[in-house]
């Protein structure tokens, strides 16, 4: 009997841990690649295609919920938004859809809670903030409604007209409750502040609202700057709202109401127009505020006039009370006869002829140092604001005149 010879067996391939890991990495990479590949499809493909591609994706569920809500299928939208939130609890858009479905179903208190949460989570969720604006306005809660409106208008200039109209209508119809809220928003100096203030420029109601806001802001942390106040003053003046203009200046005291002539010494250019000197330049007329070459560090108004051109040299608005007043100023002549070629005039801002016209210096004066001249005039009862002007008295021949003015003032005659 022959001995059996053991034949060696076929060696088994041993799978080590490294090979298993590499297989796992490959599988993971395939899955990850698939997820990356379908992301654009889930975001941009038609909802019907996206839901077949990734039915469990929170993104797709949320898109489907939005689509159902837009189509008016409220129950489907509510169910899909809840499914999306179950998979992605912080999906603001899904939360907003759920809130809007509650509102469509008549459960506005529940909708208010949900959409408030959505609005707090994201300042960019415009539909949530828009719904909250409307809801809070119906409840008379201006503070909350305007806060959400502020959130909207900070981001989107295209809706400024609608939001501004909201502020304006509320301020016109319910000023006692809404104006302090609007003023509080403006006091934070939002990026839309200038645009809103500029929009209040057409109707008498808008102008009255602008005046009221100026007074409210003056007592707060962010009063109108000189540019904003100057814009308001000019708008009121051009719209013939003289009483409102006088009221605003008196209430906010800018420039100080006690000074009949603002910057009469020509040293303070900070006051807003039209209660500030406005100088005019044209051929034959040069007016500038420069340092006096006789009195060191003293600015004054220097006028170089050819005696032939006609026009206004300088002007500012005043609000003198009715009665008798005295005009005084200092003058220094370099050349010519300013009394014959220039005059200080006062006229009503609402129209009409000059109330007074005073020669701009002593008659037949010779070049010399500074001297004072004065004149008296009356302001009637129906003239709440006046233009103080330095004007030319042109003649048919040129007569060069160079003259300085300083310390221009108006005081009660008595």
What is the role of each PLM region?
Residues 9, 13-44, 158, 183-414:
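Extracellular and organelle-lumenal recognition/adhesion modules and their flexible linkers in secreted
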Residues 32-80, 90:
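Alpha-helical segment of the N-proximal tetratricopeptide repeat
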Residues 46-51, 76-82, 109-117, 143-152, ...:
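Alpha-helical repeat scaffolds
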Residues 53, 87, 121, 155-156, ...:
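Structural marker of alpha-solenoid helical repeat scaffolds
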Residues 62-63, 93-97, 113, 126-134, ...:
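Alpha-solenoid helical repeat scaffolds
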Residues 68, 102, 136, 167-171, ...:
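Residue at a conserved register position within TPR or TPR-like alpha-solenoid repeats
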């Amino acid at each position: 009997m022959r001995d059996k010879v053991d034949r060696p067996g076929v060696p088994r391939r041993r799978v080590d841990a490294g090979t298993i890991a590499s297989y796992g990495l490959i599988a993971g990479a395939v899955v990850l690649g698939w997820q990356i590949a379908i992301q654009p499809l889930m975001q941009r493909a038609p909802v019907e295609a996206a839901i077949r591609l990734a039915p469990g994706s929170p993104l797709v569920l949320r898109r489907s919920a939005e689509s159902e809500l837009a189509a008016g299928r409220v129950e489907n939208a509510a169910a899909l938004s809840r499914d999306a939130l179950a998979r992605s609890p912080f999906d603001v858009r899904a939360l907003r859809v759920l809130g809007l479905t509650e509102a469509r179903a008549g459960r506005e208190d529940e909708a208010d809670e949900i959409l408030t949460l959505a609005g707090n989570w994201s300042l960019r969720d415009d539909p949530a903030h828009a719904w909250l604006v409307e809801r809070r306005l119906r409840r008379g809660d201006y503070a909350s409604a305007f806060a959400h409106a502020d959130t909207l208008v900070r981001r989107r200039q295209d809706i400024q007209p609608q939001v501004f109209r909201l502020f304006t209508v509320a301020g016109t119809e319910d000023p006692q409750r809404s104006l302090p809220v609007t003023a509080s928003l403006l006091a934070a100096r939002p990026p839309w502040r200038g645009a809103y203030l500029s929009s209040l420029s057409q109707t008498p109601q808008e102008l009255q609202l602008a005046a009221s806001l100026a007074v409210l802001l003056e007592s707060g942390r962010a009063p109108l700057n000189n540019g904003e106040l100057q814009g308001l003053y000019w708008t009121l003046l051009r719209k013939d709202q003289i009483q409102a203009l006088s009221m605003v200046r008196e209430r906010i005291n800018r420039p100080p109401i006690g000074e009949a002539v603002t910057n009469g010494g020509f040293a303070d250019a900070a006051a807003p127009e039209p209660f500030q000197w406005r100088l005019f330049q044209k051929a034959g007329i040069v007016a500038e505020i420069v340092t006096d070459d006789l009195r060191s560090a003293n600015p004054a108004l220097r006028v170089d006039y050819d005696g032939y051109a006609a026009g206004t040299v300088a002007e500012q608005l005043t609000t003198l009370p009715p009665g008798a007043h005295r005009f005084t100023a200092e003058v220094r002549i370099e050349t010519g006869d300013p009394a014959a070629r220039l005059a200080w005039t006062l006229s009503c801002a609402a129209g009409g002829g000059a109330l007074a016209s005073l020669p701009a210096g002593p008659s037949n004066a010779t070049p010399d140092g500074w001297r004072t001249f004065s004149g008296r005039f009356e302001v009637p009862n129906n003239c709440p604001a006046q233009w103080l002007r330095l004007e030319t008295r042109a003649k048919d021949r040129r007569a060069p005149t160079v003259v300085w003015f300083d310390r221009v003032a108006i005081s009660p005659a008595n």
